């Protein structure tokens, strides 16, 4: 039955492509196209562009489609294609080609259009399959995390030394002005002394050491052994103590979800390593005590997804809404000798929109208190957001 379902999916896609009728598979059919296991292969659902709906009806005349049923919002007809019940629908006054969650997937030798898994954030039809979607993304995440972990454990210590110098010397600089290392989000952290703080994906430990100098009890979670080595040497040089847990954040054991943390911090270039935000924010909520605060300082998607800048010139080169998963150079490669850059493994990233972020946090039950968008400090970038700080609390 699965083979027949696959054949019918590609058959109908090919017919519509040949007729230049925009379409996308929806619901359970969209899950199938994207590789998610589904529990039945008896029904297919798809949308076509509303102003060519009648052309689609004529196109499938050999399958004896039913008379269309119409409402003010939609129209649809049913037909039987090789023993599979197919629903073809249109949504009036919408444009399929500009749907931000319309996704092209390779199936054999052809491209097939479907509704992205991530549309579950906003659409009830896809939200019905949330359990299947999260299970699929979790399995995919494990593979991507393994790739990213390998990339971040290849000579990163050398890159950190090239960037910052000797850890002991850097520790001395941090001690001179630890608050500066926490700019611009320090103002949202309140009194630091005596607080229990976890820095997720805490990298090289610079922020953790600054927090420890200010009197916090600091825990760092990161999957890079080389980051841990640098961070522990940095803490020793600053004569402070930090707990560095070498672990993937999503694999962090339940003992660290005891609800006793005053603050959880994440910052700069971290969310794009996750292809599903729900498990992260659920974990953060479990870590925080009631009234505890989550502070996120991240690169703004306008600068990472949409615009390419070169001096005074700014050009739109990306698609802000694209839910694509990318393969990029590991961030520390710019601090490595040229002769070593070519041998470095690459990382897998998924860049999130502000809307996806806010919605995911809201659905986790954390309460958003602040979203501050911050400009670049470069004079040529006046008017463009570079980073943002988000503050959410567990109530």
PLM-predicted stretches and their roles:
Residues 196-252:
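Class I SAM-dependent methyltransferase SAM/SAH-binding core
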Residues 291, 295-359:
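SAM-dependent methyltransferase
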Residues 137-193, 206:
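Conserved class I S-adenosyl-L-methionine
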Residues 1-143:
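Compositionally biased terminal segments of proteins
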Residues 262-278:
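A short SAM/SAH-binding and catalytic strip from SAM-dependent methyltransferases
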Residues 356, 360-395:
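C-terminal lobe and adjacent flexible extensions of AdoMet/dcAdoMet transferase-like proteins
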């Amino acid at each position: 039955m699965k083979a027949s379902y696959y054949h019918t999916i590609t058959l109908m896609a090919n017919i519509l492509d040949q007729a230049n009728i925009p379409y996308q598979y929806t619901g359970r059919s969209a899950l199938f196209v994207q590789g998610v296991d589904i529990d039945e292969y008896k029904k297919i659902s798809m949308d076509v562009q509303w102003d060519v709906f009648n052309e689609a009806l004529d196109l499938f005349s050999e399958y004896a489609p039913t008379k269309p049923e119409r409402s003010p919002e939609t129209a649809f007809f049913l037909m039987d294609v090789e023993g599979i019940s197919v629903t073809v629908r249109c949504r009036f006054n919408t444009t399929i080609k500009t749907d931000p969650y319309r996704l092209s997937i390779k199936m054999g030798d052809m491209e097939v259009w479907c509704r992205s898994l991530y549309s579950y954030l906003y659409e009830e039809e896809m939200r019905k399959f949330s359990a299947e979607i999260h299970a699929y993304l979790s399995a995919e995440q494990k593979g991507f995390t393994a790739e990213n972990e390998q990339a971040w454990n290849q000579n990163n210590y050398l890159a950190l030394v090239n960037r910052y110098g000797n850890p002991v010397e850097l520790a001395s600089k941090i001690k001179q002005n630890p608050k500066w290392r926490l700019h611009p989000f320090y103002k949202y952290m309140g009194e630091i002394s005596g607080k229990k703080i976890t820095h997720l994906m805490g990298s090289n430990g610079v922020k953790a050491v600054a927090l420890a100098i200010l009197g916090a009890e600091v825990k760092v979670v990161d999957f890079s052994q080389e980051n841990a080595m640098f961070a522990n040497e940095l803490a020793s040089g600053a004569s402070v103590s930090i707990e560095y847990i070498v672990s993937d954040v999503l694999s962090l054991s339940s003992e660290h979800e005891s609800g006793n943390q005053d603050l959880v911090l994440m910052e700069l270039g971290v969310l794009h390593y996750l292809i599903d935000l729900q498990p992260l924010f659920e974990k953060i909520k479990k870590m925080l005590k009631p009234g505890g605060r989550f502070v996120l300082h991240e690169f703004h998607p306008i600068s990472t997804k949409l615009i390419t800048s070169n001096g005074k010139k700014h050009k739109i080169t990306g698609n802000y809404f694209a839910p694509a998963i990318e393969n990029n150079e590991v961030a520390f490669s710019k601090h490595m000798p040229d002769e070593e850059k070519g041998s470095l493994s690459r990382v897998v990233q998924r860049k999130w929109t502000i809307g996806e972020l806010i919605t995911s946090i809201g659905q986790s039950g954390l309460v958003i208190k602040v979203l501050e968008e911050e400009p670049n400090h470069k004079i040529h970038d006046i008017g463009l957001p570079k980073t943002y700080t988000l503050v959410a609390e567990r109530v």
